Amino acid sequence: MESFAIKTFGKKNVEVYDARKGYKKCDILISKGVGHNRSASALSLSAAHSKHHKLSGSKSIIFNKPIKVVEKMNKSFIFFIIDGKRIYFPDEKMNSDRWSSVGAKIEPWRKGGQHILYCAQNGRPPFFHINEELPYFQWQENFLKELSGVAKCDIVYRPHPRGRLSNKKIQSFLPSMGNVTISTNDNLYDDFLDAKCIITYNSTCSVNSIIKGIPTFVIDKDYITRGLARNGLKFIEKPLTLKRSGWLNSFGYCQWSEEEVVNGIFWRYAKKHIF
C-alpha cells in the first residue's frame, strides 16, 4: 500500500501517518482494513480511520481482505469513499475480462428453500458502521423482532464468525422468538444449502449468496450488491432475481493483485473511472 502511494504520487507528496494521532488534512486518504485482527490497537486504528474519512472530506482508497468468491483469491478488495459515500465501482458498463479470469461458477437463481438465513454483523466497534440512532445490540434486537413478525417461514440466525461478544448477547433473546433457530455451522456454504433467501446488514457474504443464486436482502443503504439485492424487508416475499452478468463484470474491478496495484494498472483504472 505504501509502495503504491509513493510510486503513484511521488515520495515528497506522501506522508505515512498514524490516524490515532488525530485528524490531518489530505487530498487522498489511503488506509487498510484491519481484517481479522481484533487487538485493541487494530480496533482503535480502524476507528480512527473511519473518523478521519468523515472529517477530511477527501477522496479515500480503502484496501481490505479479498472477498473470496473462489478458494484461492490473492487480491485486495479495494473500494473508495467520495463525498462521504462508498463507491465500489463505476456506474458505466465494464468489460468482462477481469470477472471471467476469476473462474467462479455462477449458479441459477434458486426458486425453493426451507428458511430465511440471517447473517449477522460483527457488533464490536468499529466493524459495525451504521447511522442508526440506537446502539448496535438494541438495533439488532428490534430488527430481528421485525423480521420474525413478517417472515412466513423459519429463520436461521448465523452468528458472525468474529463477533463473540455481540453473538453471546444477541443469542440470549433469540429463544423468545419461536421461529428463529441458531446455526452451529462453521462453513457459510453449509448454511446456504436450504436457504430460500439471505438477509444481512452489509456483509460481503451477500456477494457469495448472489453468485450462488440465492435471493438476497441487504439492510444498509450503501451496499455493494445494489441492483441485485433488495434493500430492507418491505418486499421480503418478492426477491430480485435479475440478470447478474453486468454487475459481476463491474465487481471484477473491485479486487486487485499486489502486482496490479504497484505497477499502476489499478491507479489508471481508478483515475479514469472513479476520480
Predicted regions located by residue number:
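Well-ordered, non-membrane alpha-helical segments in soluble/globular domains
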Residues: 1-4, 46, 133-147
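Short loop/turn segments at strand-loop or loop-helix junctions that form parts
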Residues: 32-35, 63-67, 113-127, 159-161, ...
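Catalytic donor nucleotide-activated moiety binding site of glycosyltransferases and closely related
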Residues: 141-184
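Phosphate/adenylate-binding glycine loop and adjacent helical scaffold
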Residues: 42-44, 66-77
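A donor-sugar binding/catalytic signature common to diverse glycosyltransferases
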Residues: 185-230
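Leloir-type glycosyltransferase catalytic cores
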Residues: 74-114, 227-275
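N-terminal pre-catalytic "stem/leader" segment of glycosyltransferase-like enzymes
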Residues: 1-29, 124-125, 268-275
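Short, well-ordered secondary-structure micro-motifs within conserved domains or adaptor modules
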Residues: 15-50, 54-64, 197-201
